[in-house]
From Swiss-Prot:
GO terms for molecular function: GTP binding; GTPase activity; translation elongation factor activity. This is Elongation factor Tu. Its main location: cytoplasm. Residues 175-177 are annotated as: G5. Belongs to the TRAFAC class translation factor GTPase superfamily. Classic translation factor GTPase family. EF-Tu/EF-1A subfamily. The gene is tuf. GTP hydrolase that promotes the GTP-dependent binding of aminoacyl-tRNA to the A-site of ribosomes during protein biosynthesis. PROSITE patterns: G_TR_1, G_TR_2. It comes from Oenococcus oeni (strain ATCC BAA-331 / PSU-1).
Length: 396
């Protein structure tokens, strides 16, 4: 048994999720995938009800319901997320609570693309989910094959509209419910869908293979040795004698060299993504580095003040604002490990933003921060979270 355990770890890991309009069959498809793969010993079958009863989670001060399902194909190990409500999807994608490397867009052939179909495609584009495979569901309920062709064409056009390769995206037709009920033809369709996902959604670059980045959480001095910046490594690796830059909150970037890496008071040869470490920095005094800055591989990240954000604003019930806000709203934007005040500029045609809204707006920060497309942030007022966002574009 232990050997099998070891083998499972060698499969590449990919995060995916189901997206699409309410009642188009996202959860049924998720259940069908687990059922069909369980028959090959690659998953534990989960029924609709258990996936639908998604547990509540908190991600950066926001409550989200998400179901996490695991399964394998012959080639890969997958973590699959499915969210019960539309608001849960929006919050999930914006907060990055469930990071997706690719998505299965479920569209009912009986309805065609609907408003949430469009909104989920837009969200996928804005938050950096770059690969979509389409499952055209409920095709057994449509008598005229020409109608299905028409729906497929509409879906392709919609994807192209949001800069996805609409003409090339794989579209699989089938019935998730029939597969779940054990129809052998539809079970084959599910296996085909998984083959397509294996092929079309690339294995992501592992965090450790990306350029080094560590948001600084704390700074202290070790007498006789120098200044230590501590934090959790976001990506990449760091070792003794690596050159790093101290970036953020100030206009100039400082260059230094890591002269020691420690974890739990022990010296470490190599710190990697996920590790909480302290990095000893050559020639940097106590006030030469501060919380909210980042240590990074030279040249890998710049500071910016102006960006566009894809944002979800909490409702009053979620602990958010009770009233709308307008252009020139000035909350704090919490990036990495610190708050920076910023001024909000709403897009043309948007007069105000209500609690519970999903909106794209421009922010001008009071201080430069090390940010890049895809970075997550929280919006706060007096220490309370009132929203969450993803940087969708750098504007300066």
């Amino acid at each position: 048994m232990a050997e099998k355990e070891h083998y499972e770890r060698t499969k590449p890991h990919v995060n995916i999720g189901t997206i699409g309009h309410v009642d188009h069959g996202k959860t049924t498809l998720t259940a069908a995938i687990t059922k069909v793969l369980s028959e090959k010993g690659l998953a534990q079958a989960q029924d609709y009800a258990s996936i639908d009863a998604a547990p509540e989670e908190r991600e950066r001060g926001i409550t989200i319901n998400t179901a996490h399902v695991e399964y394998e194909t012959d080639k890969r190990h997958y973590a699959h997320i499915d969210a019960p409500g539309h608001a849960d999807y929006v919050k999930n994608m914006i907060t990055g609570a469930a990071q997706m490397d690719g998505a299965i867009l479920v569209v009912a052939a009986t309805d065609g693309p609907m408003p949430q179909t469009r909104e989920h495609i837009l969200l996928a584009r804005q938050v950096g989910v770059n690969y979509i495979v389409v499952f055209l569901n409920k095709t057994d309920l449509v008598d005229d094959p020409e109608l299905i062709d028409l729906v497929e064409m509409e879906v392709r056009e919609l994807l192209s509209e949001y800069d996805f390769p609409g003409d090339d995206i794989p579209i699989i037709r089938g019935s998730a419910l029939k597969a779940l009920q054990g129809d052998p033809e539809q079970e084959k369709v599910i296996l085909h869908l998984m083959d397509v996902i294996d092929e079309y959604i690339p294995t992501p670059v592992r965090d450790v293979d990306k350029p080094f980045l560590m948001p600084v959480e704390d700074v202290f001095t070790i007498t006789g040795r120098g200044t230590v910046a501590s934090g959790r490594i976001d990506r990449g690796t760091v070792k003794i004698n690596d050159p790093v830059e101290i970036v953020g909150l100030k206009d100039e970037v400082k260059n230094t060299v890591v002269t020691g890496v420690e974890m739990f008071r022990k010296t470490l040869d190599l710190g990697e993504a996920g590790d909480n470490i302290g990095a000893l920095l050559r020639g940097i005094d106590r006030d030469g580095v501060e919380r909210g800055q980042v240590l990074a591989k030279p040249g890998s990240i710049q500071t910016h003040k102006k960006f566009k954000g894809e944002v979800y604003i909490l409702t009053k019930e979620e602990g958010g604002r009770h009233t709308p806000f307008f252009t020139n709203y000035r909350p704090q934007f919490y990036f990495h490990t610190t708050d920076v005040t910023g001024v909000v500029e709403l897009p043309e045609g948007v007069e105000m933003v209500m609690p519970g809204d999903h909106v794209t707006f421009t922010v001008e920060l009071m201080k430069p921060v090390a940010i890049e497309k895809g970075l997550k942030f929280t919006i706060r007022e007096g220490g309370h979270t009132v929203g969450a966002g993803t940087v969708s574009e750098i504007d300066d």
